[in-house]
Amino acid sequence: MTKINNINNYKIFGVFDGHGYNGEDISKSVSNYFIDYYENTKFYDETPIHIFNDYKKDDYNLIRKCIINCNENLHKTLNCEKSGTTINTIHIINTKIINTNLGDSRTIFIDGNNKVIQLIKDHTPDSIKEKERIYEMGGEVSRVEWVDYGPFRIWFKGENYPGLAMSRSLGDFDAEKIGVINIPEISDIDIVEKNIKICICASDGLWEFLSNDRVCELVLGYYNSDDVKGATRKLMEVARKTWEVNNNMGIDDITIIVLFFK
């Protein structure tokens, strides 16, 4: 979590899930760039916090610009032909939350009626619009050839490469040729208006075998006892067990952020 320029009313949380040979370096570089970009943007140094009432236009544009600049920086600094990272961030501005997604990480919100709200769908190759773009660019979408389970992946036509399980990311410069794009989706919600009490942001390792509703069930008791660390540990524990049961190839990296609003 980062508090921008020590402004109490503005905080950023994020999950950056790297993949490929240089995935760890790329995810670290992108997360650091993201924070440095916001810390060094004069918009925040010079703008009183009350002006964020008109946050949407300025912040949406700032997020998009940050991601574009970050991708250009990756071109200059790291080998990203076969590696990249997803991005899922939560910007909290007073009572507003802006959620940005690029890839297959996910954020959900739980309201006072225990209803789950997901503002942005995962960017996966099997979703209709994403698949159409990939095929138009000459790519193919299928599961790994020798198994009948697991995520759909993106391939060069007739090849067994690159096998990405997400259709949007930063980096992955080879996969850009077959429709993998770095354009994020951005949406927002008001904590007070929608009576939001829990926010969970996590990499696909949490969501692969656990539904939104199951994740909600697992954390509700911890909300009542105000035990956010316990909720995070429980999700991690259950997620790892589901991987052990459902996948004999190992356990995916799992990153989880849990926020309680009281």
Give residue ranges: language-model regions:
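PP2C/PPM-type serine/threonine phosphatase catalytic domain
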Residues: M1-K262
